[in-house]
C-alpha cells in the first residue's frame, strides 16, 4: 500500500466497464424480484468496482479464506451490487442474480452469512463499522496479519450514534488497516440526508474523530484508485460524493425512488443505455492475498484444571466469572475479553491483569462493544467474552439480535442483576434481561448460583455456538457444589431433596440460596421442599422439572430476582404447559424497585426466604 501507482488508461476503462456491469446486474436483479434498492446500488458501482477489482486482495473462489481482505456492506440494502460483484468475480453464476429475494435462493434482500462471501448480516443500519473495527483489531493485534478491512456505509446511517462509537474506537486503537467508505449519495429513504452534499462537514467530523479523511468524486474510478492507495498511520475515511440512481436517466438524484425497482420496460431501456457505454466484456481477475494470517483452532477449549473452591466459602458469581475467564485464558491465546469501562465491578480486570494483550477496553459504548465482539469472532479467529452491567446490554439489543442473524459465536456476561444489587437503585438493576436473551433465536442463557458452576458456565460458553449470556450477581453467596460436579447445557441440578418433599422450588442465583434458607425454616415445621437449580434458563431441563413436580404432588414454585414477564417462571410454565396435575406459582419483582439494602429489597418484593416459606405453606394449605 506504500506509494500510489496510477493505473493505466486500459485498467481505468476496465474498471468503468466493471462498474456499469454491476449497475446492469443490480437493475436486472431487482426488477426480476419486483423489489429491492437499485438506486442505492447504482451510487456505489464505481466504489465496488475499484474496491474488488483493483484494491482488495482475496481469493475469489474462497471468500472466507483467513488471508483475504475483509469487506462489510454496512448499507446492507445495497445487497444486489454485492451479489453482482461476486458474480463478476466468478464465484456466483450470473443467472443466480435473477433469483434475488426468492425463498429458494440464498440471495436474501440483505446480506446474510449463509452466503459464503458474507461474514456478518447487515441491514439494520449503523452496525457495520463496529463489526469492521472488530475485524481490523483482530487483524492488527491478534493475527498480526496484512489483511485489510473495508466497510461501505451510506450517508443515511451516519445519523446512527453507533457509527460514531465505532469511529472513536478505531481512532483510539489506531486501526490503520481499516478503511470506511462513505457513500454520500445525498438522499435517504424518505427525505434527503441531513447534510446532503456538504462534503466538508463530513470531512471535519471524521477528522475530529481522529481519522484521515479524503473527499473524492465517488463516480471517478481514478480518484477512487488514488484514495484507496494512500496508506496512512490511522484509520481512513473515503468520503465519496455520489448520486443515488447514478446512470438511470430520469431517476438519478431524484427523491421517492428509494427501495423501488425499475418497471420492466424502463429497466430494459436503461440497461441498453448503460450497456452502450461498456467498451470491453473482459473481466478483471481478483488479486490474491499475502498469506500471513496464522492458523487458528478454537475448538474444544477446556479449563486447565478443576475449580478450587470450598463448600461453604462465599464469593459473588460476578467475581467468580472474572477468575474463571482469566483461568480459561491460559488454555488458549484466542480467548479475549471486552468490557465497557466496568472491569472492576464485573471483575474482567482479573483477565486484563493476566492477559493484558487480549483485553479490549471498549469504554461506555455497549452497542459498539457487541459489534466489536461480532467482528472479532468472524472466521473463527477468536472466542470473545463481553462484560458490563446486565442492564446496559439492553441498549445493545439490536446488535445482539443482528449477531444471531449473523450466526455469530459471542459470549456476554451481565453482572448486577436484580434488586439484590441494593443501594444503586433501579437504573442499575437488570430485571428484563432473561426475557431479552431468551427471545434471541440462537441464545443459551446461563444463570450460575455459585463459584463452581460459574466456572463451568464460562467453559461451556466458550464451546457453545450462538449467543451465550451469563447472568451474574453482586451479593456473595456460599459455594454449594463440589469442584468435580459435572454440568452440561440444559441440565438442571436437584440441590436439596427428600422422599417427603411437598413442593418443588426453582430458584437461580440469589434466589436459589433464599430457597435453601427457606427450606431450613420449613424443616422446623416438618415441611420438606425439593430445591432445583436450573443452571440454564434456555434450554431448560424439562424432564427433571417434570420428574420433580410429579414427586411433589404437581406443585412448582418459581422465585426469581427478575420481573414476572419472560423470566424463570414463564420459562417453566411454558415447559410444563399441558401436563396434567401440575401447577406453577411465581414469585418475582412486580414493579419498578428502589434503593435499599439487598435483604430489604428481597423482602419488599417478596422473593426472600420468608416469602418463599409463606408461599410453600399456602400451596400445601390450598391442597
Curated annotation (Swiss-Prot):
InterPro entries: THDP-binding, Transketo_C/PFOR_II, Transketolase-like, Transketolase-like_Pyr-bd, Transketolase_BS, Transketolase_C, Transketolase_CS, Transketolase_N. Its cofactor is Mg(2+); Ca(2+); Mn(2+); Co(2+). The modification N6-acetyllysine is found at residues 6, 11, 144, 204, 232, 241, 260, 538, 603. It catalyses: D-sedoheptulose 7-phosphate + D-glyceraldehyde 3-phosphate = aldehydo-D-ribose 5-phosphate + D-xylulose 5-phosphate. One of its GO terms (biological process) is pentose-phosphate shunt, non-oxidative branch. Its EC number is 2.2.1.1. The keyword Magnesium applies. The modification Phosphoserine is found at residues 104, 295. It comes from the Eukaryota. There is a cross-link at residue 352 (Glycyl lysine isopeptide (Lys-Gly) (interchain with G-Cter in SUMO2)). Binds 1 Mg(2+) ion per subunit. Can also utilize other divalent metal cations, such as Ca(2+), Mn(2+) and Co(2+). Binds 1 thiamine pyrophosphate per subunit. The modification N-acetylmethionine is found at residue 1. The active site is at 366 (proton donor). One of its GO terms (molecular function) is thiamine pyrophosphate binding. The record marks 37, 258 as: Important for catalytic activity. Gene3D superfamilies: 3.40.50.920, 3.40.50.970. The keyword Calcium applies. It holds the Pfam family Transketolase_N. Belongs to the transketolase family. Catalyzes the transfer of a two-carbon ketol group from a ketose donor to an aldose acceptor, via a covalent intermediate with the cofactor thiamine pyrophosphate. Homodimer. This is Transketolase. It comes from Pongo abelii. The lineage of its organism: Eukaryota, Metazoa, Chordata, Craniata, Vertebrata. The gene is TKT.
Amino acid at each position: 500500500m506504500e506509494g500510489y501507482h496510477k493505473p493505466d488508461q486500459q485498467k481505468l476503462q476496465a474498471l468503468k466497464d466493471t462498474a456499469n456491469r454491476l449497475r446492469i446486474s443490480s437493475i436486472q436483479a431487482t426488477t426480476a424480484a419486483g423489489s429491492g434498492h437499485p438506486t442505492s446500488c447504482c451510487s456505489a458501482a464505481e466504489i465496488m468496482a475499484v474496491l474488488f477489482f483493483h484494491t482488495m486482495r482475496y481469493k475469489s473462489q474462497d471468500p472466507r479464506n483467513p488471508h483475504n481482505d475483509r469487506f462489510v456492506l454496512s448499507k446492507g440494502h445495497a445487497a444486489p451490487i454485492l451479489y453482482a460483484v461476486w458474480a463478476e468475480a466468478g464465484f456466483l453464476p450470473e443467472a443466480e442474480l435473477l433469483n434475488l429475494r426468492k425463498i429458494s435462493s440464498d440471495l436474501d434482500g440483505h446480506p446474510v452469512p449463509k452466503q459464503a462471501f458474507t461474514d456478518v448480516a447487515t441491514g439494520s443500519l449503523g452496525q457495520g463499522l463496529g463489526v469492521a473495527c472488530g475485524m481490523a483489531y483482530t487483524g492488527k493485534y491478534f493475527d498480526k496479519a496484512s489483511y485489510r478491512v473495508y466497510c461501505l456505509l451510506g450517508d443515511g446511517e451516519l445519523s446512527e450514534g453507533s457509527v460514531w462509537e465505532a469511529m472513536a474506537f478505531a481512532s483510539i486503537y489506531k486501526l490503520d488497516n481499516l478503511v470506511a467508505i462513505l457513500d454520500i449519495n445525498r438522499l435517504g429513504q424518505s427525505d434527503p440526508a441531513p447534510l446532503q452534499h456538504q462534503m466538508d462537514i463530513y470531512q471535519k467530523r471524521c477528522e475530529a474523530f481522529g481519522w484521515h479523511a479524503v473527499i473524492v468524486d465517488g463516480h471517478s474510478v481514478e480518484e477512487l484508485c488514488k484514495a484507496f492507495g494512500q496508506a496512512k498511520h490511522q484509520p481512513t475515511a473515503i468520503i465519496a460524493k455520489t448520486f443515488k440512481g447514478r446512470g438511470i436517466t430520469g431517476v438519478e438524484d431524484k427523491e421517492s425512488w428509494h427501495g423501488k425497482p425499475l418497471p420492466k420496460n424502463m429497466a430494459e431501456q436503461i440497461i441498453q443505455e448503460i450497456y452502450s457505454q461498456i467498451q470491453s466484456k473482459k473481466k478483471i481477475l481478483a488479486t490474491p492475498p499475502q498469506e500471513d494470517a496464522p492458523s487458528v483452532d478454537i475448538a474444544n477449549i477446556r479449563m486447565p484444571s478443576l475449580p478450587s473452591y470450598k463448600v461453604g466459602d462465599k464469593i459473588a458469581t460476578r467475581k467468580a466469572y472474572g477468575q474463571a475467564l482469566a483461568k480459561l485464558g491460559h488454555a488458549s491465546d484466542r480467548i479475549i475479553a471486552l468490557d465497557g469501562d466496568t472491569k472492576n465491578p464485573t471483575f474482567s480486570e482479573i483477565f486484563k491483569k493476566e492477559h493484558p494483550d487480549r483485553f479490549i477496553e471498549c469504554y461506555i459504548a455497549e452497542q459498539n462493544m457487541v459489534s466489536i465482539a461480532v467482528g472479532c469472532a468472524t472466521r473463527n479467529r477468536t472466542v470473545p467474552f463481553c462484560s458490563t452491567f446486565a442492564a446496559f446490554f439492553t441498549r445493545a439489543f439490536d446488535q445482539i439480535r443482528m449477531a444471531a442473524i449473523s450466526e455469530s459465536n459471542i459470549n456476554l456476561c451481565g453482572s448486577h442483576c436484580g434488586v439484590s444489587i441494593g443501594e444503586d437503585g433501579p437504573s442499575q438493576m437488570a430485571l428484563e434481561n432473561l426475557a431479552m436473551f431468551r427471545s434471541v433465536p440462537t441464545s443459551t442463557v446461563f444463570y450460575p448460583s455459585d463459584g463452581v458452576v460459574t466456572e463451568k458456565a464460562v467453559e461451556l460458553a466458550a464451546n457453545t455456538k450462538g449467543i451465550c449470556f451469563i447472568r451474574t450477581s453482586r451479593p456473595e453467596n456460599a459455594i454449594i457444589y463440589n469442584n468435580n460436579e459435572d454440568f452440561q447445557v440444559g441440565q438442571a441440578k436437584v440441590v436439596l431433596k427428600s422422599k417427603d418433599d411437598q413442593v418443588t422450588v426453582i430458584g437461580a442465583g440469589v434466589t436459589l440460596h433464599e430457597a435453601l434458607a427457606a427450606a431450613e425454616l420449613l424443616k422446623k415445621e416438618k415441611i420438606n421442599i425439593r430445591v432445583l437449580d436450573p443452571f440454564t434458563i434456555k434450554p431448560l431441563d424439562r424432564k427433571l422439572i417434570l420428574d420433580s413436580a410429579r414427586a411433589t404432588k404437581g406443585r412448582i414454585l418459581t422465585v426469581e430476582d427478575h420481573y414476572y414477564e419472560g423470566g424463570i417462571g414463564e420459562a417453566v410454565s411454558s415447559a410444563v404447559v399441558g401436563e396434567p396435575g401440575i401447577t406453577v406459582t411465581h414469585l418475582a419483582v412486580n414493579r419498578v424497585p428502589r434503593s435499599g439494602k439487598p435483604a430489604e429489597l428481597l423482602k419488599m418484593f417478596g422473593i426472600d426466604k420468608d416469602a418463599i416459606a409463606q408461599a410453600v405453606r399456602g400451596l400445601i394449605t390450598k391442597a
